[in-house]
């Protein structure tokens, strides 16, 4: 009998106090960050990553930018510095997919491909070796496109095509009925 994998919840923030509170509940499994969130924190990115890792999380999406070579170089550097927690986050662009393939297949580094807006992008990302694909559910819903429908469609294609190494990580989830209320925090 095949048992489904347990759902994981990632917190999208660079606020280490909030991360610490939610981690203490046992409800979150990882953290995703991006340059904007890091900038809002007013801290050095690597200082934030180190603190998140020290909290105990072993899956932190650390976004890299630039052309494919720059993303590869930065991704390898981050994965070397944070070997127990780094998942390199790249955009679903031609350069991002080239970086994903290099990082994931040649360097065995976990990669989260973000900015997924359709099934074809998810398939290309999985083919490039992505650990996670991050469809922008909230942004699609904001534009009257069924974001959760996209998750279902990607999942169906991944099941039919036996894609087992790539997981779906819903991104940009902004509806209050799908987010954890801060009143749950002790």
Segments (PLM) and residue ranges:
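Glycine-enriched alpha-helix->loop->beta-strand junction motifs that scaffold or abut catalytic
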Residues: 27-30, 82-84, 102-111, 127-133
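Single conserved hydrophobic/aromatic residue that forms the stacking wall/gate
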Residues: 177-186
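Catalytic alpha/beta core domains of metabolic enzymes, predominantly
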Residues: 94, 110-112, 123-178
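Active-site-adjacent beta->alpha loops and helix N-cap segments on the catalytic face
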Residues: 40-49, 69-71, 90-105, 119-124, ...
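Active-site beta->alpha loop and helix N-cap motifs at the rims of alpha/beta catalytic domains
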Residues: 15-19, 25, 38-39, 43-95
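Glycine-rich beta-to-alpha transition loops that act as phosphate-gripper elements at the mouths
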Residues: 12-15, 64-69, 90-94, 113-119, ...
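Conserved, mostly hydrophobic/aromatic
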Residues: 34, 88, 125
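Short beta-strand/loop segments at the ligand-binding rim of alpha/beta enzyme cores
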Residues: 2-9, 83-87, 104-112, 161-170
């Amino acid at each position: 009998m095949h048992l489904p994998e347990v759902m994981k919840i990632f917190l999208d923030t660079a606020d280490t106090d909030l991360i610490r509170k939610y981690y203490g509940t046992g409800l979150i499994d990882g953290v995703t960050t991006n340059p904007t969130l890091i900038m809002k924190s007013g801290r050095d990115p690597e200082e934030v990553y180190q603190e998140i890792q020290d909290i105990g999380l072993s899956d932190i999406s650390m976004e890299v930018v630039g052309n494919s070579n720059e993303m590869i170089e930065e991704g390898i550097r981050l994965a070397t510095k944070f070997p127990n927690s780094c998942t390199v986050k790249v955009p679903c662009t031609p350069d991002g997919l080239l970086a994903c393939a290099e990082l994931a297949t040649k360097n065995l580094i976990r990669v989260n491909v973000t900015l997924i807006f359709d099934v074809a992008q998810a398939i290309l990302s999985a083919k490039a070796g992505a650990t996670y694909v991050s469809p922008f559910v909230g942004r699609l819903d904001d534009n009257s496109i069924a974001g959760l429908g996209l998750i279902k469609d990607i999942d169906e294609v991944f099941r039919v095509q036996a894609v087992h190494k790539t997981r779906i990580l819903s991104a940009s989830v902004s509806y209050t009925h799908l987010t954890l209320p801060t009143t749950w925090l002790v």
